[in-house]
Amino acid sequence: MEHTYQYSWIIPLVPLPVPMLIGVGLLFFPTATKNLRRMWAFISILLLSIVMIFSIDLSIEQIDRTSIYQSLRTWTITSDLSFEFGYFIDPLTSIMSILITTVGILVLIYSDNYMSHDQGYLRFFAYMSFFNASMLGLVTSSNFIQIYIFWELVGMCSYLLIGFWFTRPIAAGACQKAFVTNRVGDFGLLLGILGLYWLTGSFEFRDLFEILKNLIYNNEVNLLFVTLCAFLLFAGPVAKSAQFPLHVWLPDAMEGPTPISALIHAATMVAAGIFLVARLLPLFIVIPYAMNLISLIGIITVFLGATLALAQQDIKRGLAYSTMSQLGYMMLALGMGSYRAALFHLITHAYSKALLFLGSGSIIHSMEAIVGYFPDKSQNMVLMGGLRKHVPITKTAFLVGTLSLCGIPPLACFWSKDEILNDTWLYSPIFATIAFFTAGLTAFYMFRIYLLTFEGPFNFCLQNYSGKKRNSLYSISLWGKEEPKPIKNKFHLVALLTMNNNKRASFFAKKTHRIASTVTNMPFITIFPFGAAKTFCYPHESDNTILFVMLVLVLFPLFVGAIGIPLNQEVIESDILSKLLTPSINLLQQNSTHFVDWYEVVKNPTLSVSITYFGILLAYFLYKPFYSSLHNWNILNFFAKRGPKRILWDKILNFLYDWSYNRAYIDAFYTRSLTEGIRGLAELTHLFDRRVIDGITNGVGITSFFVGEGIKYLGGSRISFYLLLYLFSLLFFLIFLFFFFFK
């Protein structure tokens, strides 16, 4: 086992050959590299599988010994300046490595089929492998220098992946927005690192924590400056994990391919911020104001993300705001000092959200066969409905992920979220109230997504389907607002062209579908308008590769929660996760008893589960009945009658809808105050530079030209006149200096 630790430095290096070889191959042997493109997918999966086995071996060693291994190499620049580079293996590293590799492998297998039609197939796998290598380097870093380097590499890879389809203006704008927003947090992180180095003289985590702790306890440092450094450090995770107020990039990141969304929102990029806060928790604990700020930002993000998800019509944007809210739960747990609960929820949420995003990718693929390759239609839940009849396997997998994320026992997220909710009562009743209420909102918006997608008729061809219907309850079921762009009467169905039989595009399916490179070369079929009685075809189930990945991911929400369930009633830390994290930081349960009371285990979740079921029933009542025969019941018509109270209720609902659909107007505020303000300042600066600075320079030149021409005219081009003028000017200058200095 000691050899496993000694060779842990290769973990971030194993996936690196893929992007390097693909780049060299495309540069020197483009034809051969493209013809062997599926070989690169296989190599990517194989290398990441090696890292996964390595990580599992490290985790087993951590459970048996609970040891921490650190290896350092010193790079001496001068006699006074040197840096230490190495790797750091502890339980947190083991957990993150397993998350990155397991989710990464499944996403790569999924992408082999999902991206088979795309001309950027090789570029996609090169980006993905480099992204995984950067994340693995981040979690194994032993000091601030290394972690900042890999932090920036992760940001660069996310920029490339979000803007993968960079020819689309929306995708190009989304990757720029993500990049700029994260630059704000990264600048704060850099300033915080430099400030702590100035205080402690070290970049190493363990040395820095010990030195800073002694300085604070001995009152040898300015506490205000230390708090400022901690706040600046926290700015990095706030941006990377999409916490308020730097959360605005996350929904726009959905413009990338769906496998990217699964990877970014599950176990990698957004989890990097949670990882860094967990890594620096010993530093934040000795600064009370820092812990308060972390918990405050967490609870705001929990509630804000849930409310913004209520009215989203794009299925991926709804899941993105769900991710934002769940990351807020993790940040809240870390701010409360509940280290174990935060990491537990990080694990359970990663697999559940990966399942949901990959399920949404399967749905989008199915819808593209009907509406064509138009993301604003294929991802629009308003145009879906009734898919449970056509994609039953996807529906089952999506339902499992939805139930897990809602916190329904005994699925995975129930155990982790309930632990966080119980800890909030010990920390703050106000925070607990908000957290429990948001748990109900989570159940509501997740089942809203599920019901709009899978239940009822297929809305794309529903007769007279639009927001123009005046039935108030019908409007509530769709959050009652039309798309800003009118729906055209005719659509063109993009024909899916099959590849040659000797070119298999997935590991399991014998054939795949390719989308033609240009619309003009595509055969198309005109679909009847919405008023038609039937359409040409209905959505179909995805290929076997996509279904296989989803069925494997279904196992994780079913069973991964077991790692946090106590196995022995006599010992409170008898579960696998506690053994792995022992000794761990848990400020809220330091005085807890050393045995498990199963009555308390059953009683404590009662409130949270009740709120969750209420949210599910509310979503079911608002969305499900209007697609059934209950729509014509007199009781519904009774509730739909207009009156003063009804009008007030509609105004409240419309306000909530507008507030949620428009992202709480935060993006608009940033656009007006920051983007347009900076552009206005830039235009003003440009105008000042052009009119004033350039005017002075050009004015001096023009004045010199005319003076020279005047002298030339007066002198008649005679050299003697020029010499005489020069002598008189020199004499005048000397007289002026004499009287000015010696008067």
UniProtKB/Swiss-Prot annotation:
Q: How does it sit in the membrane?
A: Multi-pass membrane protein
| Key words of the record | Chloroplast, Membrane, NAD, NADP, Plastid, Plastoquinone, Quinone, Thylakoid, Translocase, Transmembrane, Transmembrane helix, Transport
What enzyme class is recorded for this protein? Answer: translocase
From which domain of life does this come? Eukaryota
Q: Report the subcellular localization.
A: Plastid, Chloroplast thylakoid membrane
Record has Kinase as a keyword: no
TM spans, by residue? Answer: 9-29, 40-60, 89-109, 125-145, 147-167, 185-205, 219-239, 258-278, 280-300, 327-347, 354-374, 396-416, 425-445, 546-566, 607-627, 721-741
Residue spans making up a coiled coil are none
Query: Which one GO biological process term can you cite for this protein?
Result: ATP synthesis coupled electron transport
A GO term, aspect molecular function? NADH dehydrogenase (ubiquinone) activity
EC number(s) in its UniProt entry? 7.1.1.-
| Catalytic activity as recorded in UniProt | a plastoquinone + NADH + (n+1) H(+)(in) = a plastoquinol + NAD(+) + n H(+)(out); a plastoquinone + NADPH + (n+1) H(+)(in) = a plastoquinol + NADP(+) + n H(+)(out)
Is ATP-binding one of the keywords? Answer: no
Query: Record's family?
Result: Belongs to the complex I subunit 5 family.
Q: What is the purpose of this protein? A: NDH shuttles electrons from NAD(P)H:plastoquinone, via FMN and iron-sulfur (Fe-S) centers, to quinones in the photosynthetic chain and possibly in a chloroplast respiratory chain. The immediate electron acceptor for the enzyme in this species is believed to be plastoquinone. Couples the redox reaction to proton translocation, and thus conserves the redox energy in a proton gradient.
UniProt protein name = NAD(P)H-quinone oxidoreductase subunit 5, chloroplastic
Origin organism is Citrus sinensis (Sweet orange)
